[in-house]
Amino acid sequence: MIIIDTGCANLSSVKFAFDRLNIKAEISRDIATIKSADKLLLPGVGTAMAAMKILQDRNLIETIQNATQPMLGICLGMQLMTEYSSEGNVPTLSLMSGHTDLIPNTGLPLPHMGWNKVRYEQDHPLFAGIEQDSHFYFVHSYAVLPNEHTIATSDYGVPFSAALGCKNFYGVQFHPERSGKNGAQLLKNFVENL
């Protein structure tokens, strides 16, 4: 398992989440290491524009786009998997269709921060052993509205994609590394089931 070094703040907490599961995970930006990994994790905290610049500066965009092994994007990492983000009006990785937009104003404060229910729409291996409507921890102001790649939703005034999946690419808007036993189970499922 390689955690792609995106330079974001949650790298260590993601690695510690795997350590707690006794799953060997290494943080790397080395292209050869990333290409040879059995699984990849794309973490992200911050803005889409800054994250894409870091990926470009580290020559990682093409490597990520050409990955054939299972990859899990977390929070901004999931958003980067789509085609475009209105956060900075930046093209993203285009690993699946869809775009990321500011959560529509429904009178609720932004960012959406805290625990929220997740309802998975399909019997997906990423959610094996996790009860329907389980709570996960979110911190975000931008989201991907439900589309053909949505495998789970949550609601913050409007429904949004809590998880996406397309081919070997998966993403979660919430932070599994901060979501207790449900998050730990999801990370374990990613490693063991995908």
Swiss-Prot record:
One of its GO terms (biological process) is L-histidine biosynthetic process. This is Imidazole glycerol phosphate synthase subunit HisH. Gene3D superfamilies: 3.40.50.880. PANTHER family: IMIDAZOLE GLYCEROL PHOSPHATE SYNTHASE SUBUNIT HISH. The keyword Transport does not apply. Its EC number is 4.3.2.10, 3.5.1.2. SUPFAM superfamilies: Class I glutamine amidotransferase-like. It holds the Pfam family GATase. IGPS catalyzes the conversion of PRFAR and glutamine to IGP, AICAR and glutamate. The HisH subunit catalyzes the hydrolysis of glutamine to glutamate and ammonia as part of the synthesis of IGP and AICAR. The resulting ammonia molecule is channeled to the active site of HisF. Residues 1-194 form the Glutamine amidotransferase type-1 domain. It comes from the Bacteria. Pathway: Amino-acid biosynthesis; L-histidine biosynthesis; L-histidine from 5-phospho-alpha-D-ribose 1-diphosphate: step 5/9. Its main location: cytoplasm. InterPro entries: Class_I_gatase-like, GATASE, Imidazole-glycPsynth_HisH. It is found in: Cytoplasm. Keywords: Amino-acid biosynthesis, Cytoplasm, Glutamine amidotransferase, Histidine biosynthesis, Hydrolase, Lyase. It catalyses: 5-[(5-phospho-1-deoxy-D-ribulos-1-ylimino)methylamino]-1-(5-phospho-beta-D-ribosyl)imidazole-4-carboxamide + L-glutamine = D-erythro-1-(imidazol-4-yl)glycerol 3-phosphate + 5-amino-1-(5-phospho-beta-D-ribosyl)imidazole-4-carboxamide + L-glutamate + H(+); L-glutamine + H2O = L-glutamate + NH4(+). The keyword Ribonucleoprotein does not apply. Heterodimer of HisH and HisF. GO terms for molecular function: glutaminase activity; imidazoleglycerol-phosphate synthase activity; lyase activity. Disulfide bonds: none annotated. GO terms for cellular component: cytoplasm. The active site is at 75 (nucleophile), 175, 177.
